[in-house]
């Protein structure tokens, strides 16, 4: 009799767990957050804010502060390669300082770029204004392509912060999935 009761309790708990996953998905279990139609896992040392700017989904920064920022864009114009080329052209560098990687997964394609040099801060308001240059800067860029949508992640900051956050950046972009 006790064994049947224990078996019944275990079966009910298991069914409850399966129902929870069916209704809520696994994002909460794995610590993933959501914005619009994607989910992502945020590194412990980062803060995310939903952006009110056009095309931007998230603006991310370090909890500790520092000259480092990450932006997650959705469906901006251009292909993965065109956007990576645009990011590369925002830097004064030698081509030997650019590392690009392309990765094919079952449901998405991921392209990444890493580079270091002098950053020419884009001025979207006045393109004729003198360029603001920031030396000893780096960029980590990622493009995540799904069947019918594309997401861009761009991190810019001081070289040491970019290098220290490369692993977090890669974990973040690989965690992005459609809901």
Region locations from a protein language model:
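Conserved hydrophobic/aromatic beta-strand scaffold that supports enzyme active sites
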Residues: 110-112
